[in-house]
Amino acid sequence: AAKMAKNVDKPLFTATFNVQASSADYATFIAGIRNKLRNPAHFSHNEPVLPPVEPNVPPSRWFHVVLKASPTSAGLTLAIRADNIYLEGFKSSDGTWWELTPGLIPGATYVGFGGTYRDLLGDTDKLTNVALGRQQLEDAVTALHGRTKADKASGPKQQQAREAVTTLLLMVNEATRFQTVSGFVAGLLHPKAVEKKSGKIGNEMKAQVNGWQDLSAALLKTDVKPPPGKSPAKFTPIEKMGVRTAEQAAATLGILLFVEVPGGLTVAKALELFHASGGK
């Protein structure tokens, strides 16, 4: 069982986005999240890196995202871990916190399904079937904000909630992790786009989304200082992601997951640098 989280109700920051806003506003919203999450003392190829997940402690570093279906609405609040960008909960209009990991968030109600794409879609390959766009974002926000306790017993309502969570994961969480995804979504929100423009990610982006840790590790390996007389490690191409060079990896990632790689920063050292640079 998960250790109960701390500080879910005391976010490090809150980022707000109005679903009707422009693609430029969306880009600013996502860039702002990356900027606030990064370890100020750690970059890879000029890309920000998250501080490490602290070992053996319950998650205690959180941020909130508030998504408003209209400028005057109260908005749907998402609770997201600041160390790995995992979506763990959302708050419906009746004040209920719904959690995706049973027993993680104090006082929350388990939504009835987990937050992995296997839980949500049955198969990670189905990510390429998920339609994204302004209408989908609005529908997702409306569905989760309007959720009631009775919905958990309804098959159709549970399916609607699964689809809504998947939409938000791609348009917020994966968009924060990947410049490719945020660029794709920004294109769908472009004011010149047809009013109801939607799109689906392709196979390369699907592989990226499913391989954030692998891609982060591959880029971090190229940062390791080589022994005297040796040249730095070359980037190992990841063909299914369409990423063949370190430069392409840096252009794909929005922020790296911290991964310990041989000869690189340790968890302890990265945390020390994070705290020394004012990280909370």
Swiss-Prot record:
Reported function: Inhibits the elongation phase of protein synthesis. It inactivates fungal ribosomes even more effectively than mammalian ribosomes and is thought to function as a constitutive antifungal agent in plants.
Q: Where is this chain primarily localised? A: cytoplasm
Q: What is its EC number?
A: 3.2.2.22
Q: Name one GO molecular function term.
A: toxin activity
Active site (UniProt): 174
GO CC term (a single one): cytoplasm
The miscellaneous remark of the record is: Three similar RIP 30 isoforms I, II, and III have been described in Barley.
- The name this protein carries in UniProt is Protein synthesis inhibitor II
One Pfam family here: RIP
Kindly state which reaction or reactions the protein catalyses.
Endohydrolysis of the N-glycosidic bond at one specific adenosine on the 28S rRNA
Give the species: Hordeum vulgare
